[in-house]
């Protein structure tokens, strides 16, 4: 590439093009940056070490931030990288630019200067093709280009006609595990976004077809032990179930599979725990949902890219805590970059804490649209009974004996029968210690027993011990045990490698694609 000009030209070969003499230029620096990433991927082809693909996928965010994924750069790279005999070249150019007959002068000479590790020999057709790893990565770059360009219809068509049949159904290599996971992410993301933005008649049929296709490839990924692809497909299928309100189907789906917790990026695990928490919260299992949402917040990368996910997770965590009868601490609502997003939930918490049913109703009405957008409205509506129970508890602590009618007036309830029912539930749930006199229509609180004579302290300490043991076990599993330094130095000297190794865990954290979901809202 040293012989190329600073601005490399891409000529149009259209016959009827009135402006065929015009040229679009691709900057050499941008092309060189792409070639560096491709060169890193080619090392995986030679060594079968997936760390190089991890590093390349980590560089995707910087490529997008620097706007290197533009039509001119991609068009030039595809024209030079792919031989004219390649069956993938035409399809890529077709979706990058409207005129897929564009060409690069001297592309053959430039191609000859590329490393031989970029190419492989197709024994069946007896032609030279780009290696599977680089080919799939180039298709991923085109996906990102169409996504960033808001070309959703073209992206869906590209996925349906090119990516799924020509890549995912064609290649059968374990080295493609990481790239395939990314490809599936943007396949489903583009489908979901287009379905939300446009009301198509056949959207339900297309959704069923896509879900069945993901189920099919989930079986293949499980058999091949492609953990990253398997985890990605499980998350996407769960997201699809929840998008369509099929909570029971999602629960059955989870019960019939085993999620891979090894060799999986932390962002995928965080998303999986979030979905599990959502499902359990809808099914009234709040204690299990609370455990999963705490795990999701801990697993998620704590950086600017995952801010939207962390905000949504904390909103769900607040709702679950309130439904469990717990009140979040004030510091919970003052976390950095979350004060504004958690403001509606702060007012809800305040209403629940005071047992003020009137304030609770006005807060729900005021922030209804925000709660619907967060998909927590139904959970927040369930808090009405908690508000009433809290109000009854405050009243029982204040009065030794009080009539049901007075409670009805204080809590603004409909009738005395409603009050009697709610007080009965509060007594059953252990919220208050009281007796109801049905004949005279009043309740009488009893003396509170010494709490240390009950089993409550034992249960609290048991929960704390279990949490500490679970945290200890998870840290042991996630620890990296480095090899002997002498062995590493000997291997590096033999292979001639002097570059610093990066921990796989760091690469997994930085490879998060959570930020692309922020605009959609996180279930």
Swiss-Prot record:
GO terms for molecular function: enzyme regulator activity. It comes from the Eukaryota. GO terms for biological process: proteasome-mediated ubiquitin-dependent protein catabolic process; regulation of protein catabolic process; ubiquitin-dependent protein catabolic process. One of its GO terms (cellular component) is proteasome regulatory particle, lid subcomplex. The keyword Transcription does not apply. The modification N-acetylalanine is found at residue 2. Residues 270-450 form the PCI domain. InterPro entries: 26S_Psome_reg_C, CSN3, PCI_dom, WH_DNA-bd_sf. Residues 496-523 have a biased composition (Acidic residues). Keywords: Acetylation, Phosphoprotein, Proteasome. Residues 480-523 are annotated as: Disordered. Residues 480-495 have a biased composition (Basic and acidic residues). Belongs to the proteasome subunit S3 family. Acts as a regulatory subunit of the 26S proteasome which is involved in the ATP-dependent degradation of ubiquitinated proteins. The 26S proteasome is composed of a core protease, known as the 20S proteasome, capped at one or both ends by the 19S regulatory complex (RC). The RC is composed of at least 18 different subunits in two subcomplexes, the base and the lid, which form the portions proximal and distal to the 20S proteolytic core, respectively. This is 26S proteasome regulatory subunit RPN3. It comes from Saccharomyces cerevisiae (strain ATCC 204508 / S288c).
């Amino acid at each position: 590439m040293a012989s190329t000009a600073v601005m490399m030209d891409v000529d149009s070969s259209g016959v009827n093009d009135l402006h065929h003499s015009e040229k679009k230029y691709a900057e050499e620096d941008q092309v060189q940056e792409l070639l560096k990433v491709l060169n890193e991927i080619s090392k995986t082809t030679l060594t079968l070490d997936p760390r190089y693909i991890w590093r390349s996928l980590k560089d995707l965010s910087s490529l997008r931030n620097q706007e290197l994924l533009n039509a001119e750069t991609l068009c030039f790279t595809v024209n030079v990288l792919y031989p004219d005999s390649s069956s993938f070249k035409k399809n890529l150019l077709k979706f990058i630019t409207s005129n897929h007959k564009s060409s690069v002068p001297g592309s053959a000479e430039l191609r000859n200067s590329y490393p031989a590790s970029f190419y492989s020999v197709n024994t069946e057709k007896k032609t030279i093709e780009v290696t599977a790893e680089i080919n799939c990565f180039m298709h991923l770059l085109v996906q990102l280009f169409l996504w960033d360009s808001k070309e959703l219809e073209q992206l869906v068509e590209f996925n349906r006609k090119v990516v799924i049949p020509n890549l995912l159904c064609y290649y059968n290599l374990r080295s493609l595990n990481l790239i395939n996971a990314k490809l599936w992410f943007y396949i489903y993301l583009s489908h979901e976004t287009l379905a939300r933005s446009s009301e198509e008649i056949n959207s339900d049929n297309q959704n069923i077809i896509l879900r069945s296709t993901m189920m099919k490839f989930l079986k293949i990924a499980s058999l091949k032990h492609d953990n990253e692809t398997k985890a990605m497909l499980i998350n996407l299928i769960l997201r699809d179930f929840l998008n369509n309100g099929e909570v029971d189907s999602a629960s059955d789906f989870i019960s019939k599979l085993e999620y891979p917790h090894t060799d999986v990026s932390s962002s995928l695990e965080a998303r999986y725990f979030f979905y599990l928490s959502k499902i359990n919260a809808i099914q009234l299992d709040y204690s299990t949902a609370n455990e999963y949402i705490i795990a999701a917040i801990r697993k998620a990368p704590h950086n600017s890219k995952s801010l939207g996910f962390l905000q949504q997770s904390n909103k769900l965590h607040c709702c679950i805590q309130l439904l469990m009868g717990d009140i979040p601490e004030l510091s919970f609502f003052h976390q950095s970059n979350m004060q504004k997003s958690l403001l509606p939930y702060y007012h809800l918490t305040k209403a629940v804490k005071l047992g003020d049913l009137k304030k609770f109703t006005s807060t729900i009405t005021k922030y209804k649209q925000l709660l619907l957008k967060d998909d927590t409205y139904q959970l927040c509506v369930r808090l009405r009974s908690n508000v009433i129970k809290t109000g009854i508890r405050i009243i029982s602590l204040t009065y030794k004996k009080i009539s049901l009618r007075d409670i009805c007036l204080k809590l603004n309830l409909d009738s005395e029968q409603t009050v009697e029912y709610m007080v009965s539930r509060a007594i059953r749930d252990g919220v208050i210690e009281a007796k109801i006199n049905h004949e005279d229509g009043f309740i009488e609180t009893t003396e509170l027993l010494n709490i240390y004579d009950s089993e409550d302290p034992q249960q609290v300490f048991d929960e704390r011990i279990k949490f500490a043991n679970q945290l200890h076990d998870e840290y042991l599993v996630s620890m990296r045990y480095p090899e002997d330094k002498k062995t590493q130095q000997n291997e590096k000297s033999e292979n001639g490698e002097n570059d610093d190794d990066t921990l796989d865990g760091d690469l997994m954290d930085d490879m998060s694609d959570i930020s692309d979901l922020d605009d959609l809202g996180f279930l």
